[in-house]
Regions:
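A metal-dependent hydrolase metal-coordination microenvironment
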Residues: 1-79, 84-87, 91-94, 100-118, ...
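C-terminal functional module detector
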Residues: 130-327
């Protein structure tokens, strides 16, 4: 099945809503730094946002508001664009499910590996972020393939939450038809024969050889690179809580698989449980931020009062001096 999600800013588009493959979605964010989110399976629009550059807790508040609907899927859009999300933010933020890894404007690998290294179960999507549906060159390059039978949006979202998907980057071929791109994507569905984790050993099997397979570990470190192969096995080290795989095809197509976690039970946790488990590890505190703001206001008021008293003393001195000279 093919799912088309037409996202607009702060509006859930209802075009084709009677179709089985309709996905309610909208893009959130009208701020200067493009700190945007994509809400897939949205039932309502969260209108609140912070227009000026956001603090970590501004960002966390917005994500928490979106995550109150436990059936939706929250994606951090193009985090590398305008540093809408700083890489270090991803060590601490919770209540989201995916990162938009592939985008025409920026790719956010450092953000993804930072979140994974911090112990967050975060998956990825590819997105054309196209604002002109009549430009075939800009459609179908960055996509998300979902594996398994998903005949409606609810099942699709469920599979995405389980990481049963892959982000795809098709090479740029000028004037390539949409049908040609569709054919390539359909063929990719059968490429991955199986991925397993047995006795701390990652195994991947493909239906045909690819130009290159890379295995990535903590902090985005390259653990293994092999060329012209159709299968490999790789052991988890004591320092790796996750491993992820990248596939490079001869025609330039790139596939970014979602991570495999050493602890399968942890890999199956939902965003709310993950937030509960890790929130105590956060090095920041909303109360401290409020205290800091209050302190700044207090200092500002104190400075104004000092200046006011100083001006009054100067004014009093001028009056006294004038009075004496007149005397």
């Amino acid at each position: 099945h093919t799912f088309h999600a037409l996202s607009q800013y702060h509006k859930i588009d209802t075009f084709n809503k009677e179709k089985q493959n309709y996905v309610p979605v909208y893009e959130h964010g009208y701020n200067l730094k493009k700190t945007h989110q994509l809400v897939i399976g949205a039932k309502r629009v969260v209108w609140k946002d912070y227009i000026f550059p956001q603090t970590l807790h501004n960002k966390q508040f917005i994500l928490h508001e979106m995550a109150k609907d436990t059936n939706n899927l929250v994606v951090l859009n193009h985090p590398a664009v305008r540093s809408g999300y700083d890489v270090n933010d991803l060590k601490l933020l919770h209540y989201y499910d995916h990162i938009e890894l592939l985008n025409p404007s920026a790719q956010s690998f450092a953000h993804w590996d930072t979140a994974l290294t911090a112990g967050k179960k975060i998956f990825v999507v590819g997105n054309d972020d196209n604002h002109n549906i009549f430009n075939d060159n800009a459609i179908g390059r960055f996509t998300t393939l979902i594996f398994g039978a998903a005949s409606d949006s609810k099942k699709m979202i469920d599979r995405m939450k389980k990481g049963q998907s892959v982000a795809v980057w098709l090479p740029q071929i000028h004037n390539e038809t949409l049908e040609s791109k569709r054919s390539k994507l359909l063929n990719l569905h059968s490429l991955i024969s199986g991925i397993s984790l047995i006795d701390s050993m990652l195994a991947i099997n493909l239906s045909k050889s690819v130009a290159e397979i890379r295995v990535i570990g903590h902090h985005g470190k390259l653990k293994l690179k092999q060329r012209n192969i159709s299968s490999l096995t790789f052991p988890f080290s004591q320092n790796d809580a996750y491993l992820r795989v990248e596939l490079y095809l001869e025609d330039g197509t790139k596939l970014y698989l979602n991570p495999i976690f050493r602890d399968i039970a942890e890999g199956n946790q939902g965003r709310n449980l993950i937030a509960t488990n890790y929130i105590s590890r956060d090095r920041t505190n909303p109360l401290m931020e409020s205290f800091a703001l209050a302190s700044m206001i207090g200092i500002f008021v104190s400075v104004r009062n000092v200046k006011k008293r100083k001006n009054m003393r100067i004014k009093d001195m001028n009056i006294d001096t004038t009075g004496m000279s007149l005397g």
